[in-house]
């Protein structure tokens, strides 16, 4: 259908539209008109992706000079593929309406591991090895040697792409990862470099967060993208953690030992080259005097280790004299390494700021701040000059150099914590240095400054106002949308007591209490008797899950549960978990029914949708607070309190509730889907916890369902499931939660649509 969204003609590839999709498009258009940033919370399963794509593509076509590109960031590869499929649908609808092929290019970009087609590289399992192997076949000096001697190893796909792929831009169309690989096989071009080259003139690019937020990668991939782009972060409820991880470095004793052997290897290589080809080292010295910008003008294939973060003025100036020659630089790294090793020989925990660390460094081993900032770049230049083929071996040393660059660049927003042992195993000496980022806004700030509109969206962003605070930006629109339903298909309830009236909670004091564990088991047992097909249960941590399940086994509860449904458990091993998931789905298909026990913040809670019968009930055992004794977390809470005036308790509750909402949101994946959401902890009933749930869940959480016993909860569930089992046709939805074009244009509907969005 063709819609008029606030004066913009939008092609929408379906015959009917949800009212909230229309409302979402209105808010989105206002954000783009204002050329600002937006935070939008849209209920899960209401067609967020297609609304985003339809509106922004229409905007691109109406104002080609205002918005040149859509950069869509998603979290996992399956999600990226989903977005590309929606885009394909949208485009074929455009072509069917206009009767001609559009000059439109949309593509997905992923790591070499997912795109490489070279027969020697594809069998490798880990991304790091794939990158290293690729570099050893495509580095500029490897290719130069191959020009002289054709028998040397090389990558024919890259050679072919380099020779012919650049003149011909990618033909218009939509490409997912498999399409790119197929095209690569057909033409004999490298799909990875083809995709990287093509994102510059693509209309829509879909890739993962790291390509924009991790400065080491963003510098390589996203540097050339124009300012007039719209960036969308989808499923962005965890975006602050992604930002923090991309800027943090952990150094262990093992890493440092491997740095030592890296340095020895480099030392030998330098000596060998001095004897055979001293001119090469002289050339490098000359380049470094001219400034880093010249030194890094090497080919794209060599830019394998990018720089963590360097402002432009540093790249312009010459490298300090003390680290210009290769031997001096290696000596410099040795002194740095010795100092860090010495710092790791501690008996108690040390916490200090980067400036304090630097002054200690200057006093002990006379290393100044300025040469440290050049460490990462200087190492990159050296590895290039020495023609090191396999860069994966040098990742420990690269990590140390990145740490040096970061520690000398940022004085605020970071902390250094040195722990002599892991808290969980205090007897084993296992020292580790955490260089931990506490300010999520550091990584995302360049994105907000560089692109004219950044949209942060997810099903669970409540409370909305905390995101602009922790990411430090000013949105022009902030809105949360309700879910318009023809029948109430979600049933949230809070179970706070067992049948024996014992309060149930996962808090630390009552965690080991046998009565609480028994009541939790009883809840799962009774639910497994009334809920059809699949139940997903989330615990607060792996430890808690293991101890609870062991206790249920002793009490014979597990045996009774198994009579109703089969049990599957998520473990920390990825391969085991995928098998468990597969079998869980099989058991649901066969009608045997299944229960999946998993962990909030685990793999299952983040990316896996339990559509229809795979998840008819989600049970949240306890409030999923993060492990609060961790020193890194304490430092971050302190920073948030001082810098952004966010109270510790508010942040912890916000963090726990967004994860709880994320877990229970897995059950509802569309308006025809239905499911129970059981919050099993008396603390959920408190106003401060309940108020932090997304608006679309809060609306259906009635006062009568706030503090139930297990029996009352089961009665509510029975009644709800019986209602849901009645036949439900599309006709029942029409005009209420599903609109045709005529209905959408009526005044009454437009008035209703106005009320869906709640601005902040």
Swiss-Prot record:
It holds the Pfam family DEAD_2. It is an enzyme of class 5 (isomerase). GO terms for molecular function: 4 iron, 4 sulfur cluster binding; 5'-3' DNA helicase activity; ATP binding; ATP hydrolysis activity; damaged DNA binding; metal ion binding. It comes from the Eukaryota. Its EC number is 5.6.2.3. Its cofactor is Mg(2+); [4Fe-4S] cluster. A motif (DEAH box) lies at residues 234-237. Keywords: 4Fe-4S, ATP-binding, Chromosome partition, Cytoplasm, Cytoskeleton, DNA damage, DNA repair, DNA-binding, Helicase, Hydrolase, Iron, Iron-sulfur, Isomerase, Magnesium, Metal-binding, Nucleotide-binding, Nucleus, Transcription, Transcription regulation, Ubl conjugation. This is General transcription and DNA repair factor IIH helicase subunit XPD. It comes from Cricetulus griseus (Chinese hamster).
């Amino acid at each position: 259908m063709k819609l008029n969204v606030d004066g913009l003609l939008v092609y929408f590839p379906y015959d009917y539209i949800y009212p909230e999709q229309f409302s979402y498009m209105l808010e989105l258009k206002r954000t783009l008109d204002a050329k600002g940033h937006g935070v939008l919370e849209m209920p899960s399963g209401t067609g967020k992706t297609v609304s985003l794509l339809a509106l922004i593509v229409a905007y691109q076509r109406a104002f080609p000079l205002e918005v040149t590109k859509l950069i869509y960031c998603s979290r996992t590869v399956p999600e990226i593929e989903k977005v590309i499929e929606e885009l394909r649908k949208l485009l074929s609808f455009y072509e069917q309406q206009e009767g001609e092929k559009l000059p439109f290019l949309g593509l997905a970009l992923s790591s070499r591991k997912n795109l490489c087609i070279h027969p020697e590289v594809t069998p490798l399992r880990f991304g790091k090895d794939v990158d290293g192997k690729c570099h050893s076949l495509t580095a500029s000096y490897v290719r130069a040697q191959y020009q002289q001697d054709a028998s040397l190893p090389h990558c024919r796909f890259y050679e072919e792409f380099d020779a012919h792929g650049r003149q011909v831009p990618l033909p218009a169309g939509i490409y997912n990862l498999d399409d790119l690989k197929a095209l690569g096989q057909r033409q004999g071009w490298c799909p990875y470099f083809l995709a990287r080259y093509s994102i510059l003139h693509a209309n829509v690019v879909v890739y993962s967060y790291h390509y924009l937020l991790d400065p080491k990668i963003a510098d390589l991939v996203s540097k050339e993208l124009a300012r007039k782009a719209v960036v969308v972060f989808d499923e962005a409820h965890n975006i602050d953690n992604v930002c923090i991880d991309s800027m943090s470095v952990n150094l262990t004793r093992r890493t440092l030992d491997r740095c030592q052997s890296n340095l020895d290897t480099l030392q030998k290589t330098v000596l060998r080259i001095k004897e055979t080809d001293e001119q090469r080292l002289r050339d490098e010295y000359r380049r470094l005097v001219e400034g880093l910008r010249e030194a890094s003008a090497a080919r794209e294939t060599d830019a394998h280790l990018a720089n963590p973060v360097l402002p432009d003025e540093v790249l312009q100036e010459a490298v300090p004299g003390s680290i210009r020659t290769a031997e001096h630089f290696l000596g410099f790294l040795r002194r740095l390494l010795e100092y860090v090793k010495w710092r790791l020989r501690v008996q108690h925990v040390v916490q200090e700021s980067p400036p304090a660390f630097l002054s200690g460094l200057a006093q002990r081993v006379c290393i100044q701040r300025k040469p440290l900032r050049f460490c990462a770049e200087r190492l990159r230049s050296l590895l290039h000059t020495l023609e090191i083929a396999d860069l994966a071996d040098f990742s420990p040393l690269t990590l140390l150099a990145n740490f040096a660059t970061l520690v000398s660049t940022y004085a605020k927003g970071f902390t250094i914590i040195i722990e002599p042992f892991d808290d969980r195993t205090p007897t084993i000496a296992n020292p580790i240095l955490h260089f931990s980022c506490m300010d999520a806004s550091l990584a995302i700030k360049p994105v907000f400054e560089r692109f004219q509109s950044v949209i942060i969206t997810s099903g669970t962003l409540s409370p909305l106002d905390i995101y602009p605070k922790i990411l430090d930006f000013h949105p022009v629109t902030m809105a949360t949308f309700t879910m318009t339903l023809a029948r109430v298909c979600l049933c949230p309830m809070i179970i706070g007591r067992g049948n024996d009236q014992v309060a149930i909670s996962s808090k630390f004091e009552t965690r080991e209490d046998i009565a609480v564990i028994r009541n939790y088991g009883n809840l799962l047992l009774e639910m497994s008797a009334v809920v059809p097909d699949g139940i997903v249960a989330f615990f607060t941590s792996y430890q808690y899950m293991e101890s609870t399940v062991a206790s249920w086994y002793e009490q014979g509860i597990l045996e009774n549960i198994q009579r109703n449904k089969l049990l599957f458990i998520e473990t920390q091993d990825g391969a085991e978990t995928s098998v468990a998931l597969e079998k869980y789905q099989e058991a649901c298909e066969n009608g045997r029914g299944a229960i999946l026990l998993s962990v909030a913040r685990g793999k299952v809670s983040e990316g896996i949708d339990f559509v229809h019968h795979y998840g008819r009930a989600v049970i949240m055992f306890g409030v999923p607070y993060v492990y609060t004794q961790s020193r890194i977390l304490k430092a971050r809470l302190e920073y948030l309190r001082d810098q952004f005036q966010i109270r510790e308790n508010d942040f912890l509750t916000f963090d726990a509730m967004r994860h709880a909402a994320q877990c229970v949101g897995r059950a509802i994946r569309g308006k025809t889907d239905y499911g129970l959401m059981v919050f099993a902890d008396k603390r959920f009933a408190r106003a401060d916890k309940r108020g932090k749930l997304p608006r679309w869940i809060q609306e259906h959480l009635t006062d009568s369902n706030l503090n139930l016993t297990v029996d009352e909860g089961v009665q509510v569930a029975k009644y709800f499931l019986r209602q849901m089992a009645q036949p439900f046709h599309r006709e029942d939805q029409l005009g209420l939660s599903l609109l045709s074009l005529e209905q959408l244009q009526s005044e009454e509907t437009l008035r209703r649509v106005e009320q869906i969005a709640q601005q902040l």
